[in-house]
């Protein structure tokens, strides 16, 4: 069985741990039954997820050979772990013939990942906002075609644990209120294609001020985006950066060429995936 899952960009600035979107950048996972599994195979996130599914449903997990055709860069803030989890759950649900409802699979994915901002958009496609503290509640929307997206992928990795450790444990009430308001506005701006609303709602107080120091060239790249009337966010935990522009903005197409940066950055133009994960065959 082959399962295809899109990469994602989470947070979108103020939407920390609750908002994300999917792109047409895919990992394809190949699942085959086998008689022998190495210890390395047993410890993979994909197989651990399959085991989780079978244990939750009082079944014994099959032995599997799992290979990946990977196009989503690892440890770059693009939801590579979410692709592993979603692929394994889709496989297990189909292979076991249990055919559990989508809501249950999404709850499993969030329990395994610990937060919904990558696993939900990877599974569902589009733009997703979700809450998990009192049961999983989410809303999916399609992103306006008035935007275009440039992903800046660095030549250095960012460990999620390190990025999470950088975030402060306490925040001022004013900053919390600002983030709540702006995350709502960003979701709406992405739906209706309002670039002005997006730009005016992009400031985050929870994670970007603390994570940006871990990303070389951040301030320079942010300034380039601002000068070209675009918005730049740290994608997930980093190190990748997501630039959102008006679809008619021609200047942004070459704005990140020939950069005199410390790190090497690759600019990739991406389209939104509105369909999410699915079984190829």
Positions of predicted regions on the chain:
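DPxDG-like acidic metal-binding loop motif
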Residues: 78-101, 123-128
């Amino acid at each position: 069985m082959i399962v295809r899952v899109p990469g994602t960009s989470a947070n979108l600035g103020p939407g920390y741990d609750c908002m994300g979107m999917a792109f047409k950048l895919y990992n394809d996972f190949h699942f085959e039954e086998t008689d022998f599994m190495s210890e390395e195979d047993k410890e993979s996130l994909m197989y651990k997820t399959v085991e989780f599914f079978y244990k939750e449903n009082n079944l014994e997990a099959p032995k599997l050979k799992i290979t990946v055709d990977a196009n989503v860069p690892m440890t770059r803030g693009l939801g590579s772990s979410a692709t592993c989890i979603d692929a394994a759950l889709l496989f297990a649900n189909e292979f076991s013939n249990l055919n559990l409802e989508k809501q249950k699979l999404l709850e499993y994915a969030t329990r395994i990942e610990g937060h919904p901002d990558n696993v939900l958009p990877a599974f569902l496609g589009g733009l997703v906002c979700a809450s998990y503290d009192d049961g999983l509640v989410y809303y999916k929307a399609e992103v306006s075609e008035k935007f275009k997206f440039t992903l800046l992928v660095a030549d250095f990795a960012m460990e999620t644990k390190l990025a999470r450790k950088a975030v402060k444990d306490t925040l001022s009430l004013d900053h919390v209120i600002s983030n709540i308001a702006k995350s709502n506005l960003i979701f709406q701006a992405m739906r209706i294609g309002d670039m002005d609303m997006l730009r005016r709602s992009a400031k985050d107080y929870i994670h970007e001020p603390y994570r940006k120091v871990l990303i070389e060239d951040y301030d320079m790249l942010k300034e380039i985006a601002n000068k070209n009337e675009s918005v730049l966010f740290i994608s997930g935990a980093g190190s990748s950066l997501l630039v959102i522009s008006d679809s008619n903005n021609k200047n942004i197409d070459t704005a990140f060429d020939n950069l005199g940066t410390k790190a090497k950055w690759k600019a990739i133009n991406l389209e939104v995936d509105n369909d999410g994960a699915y079984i190829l065959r």
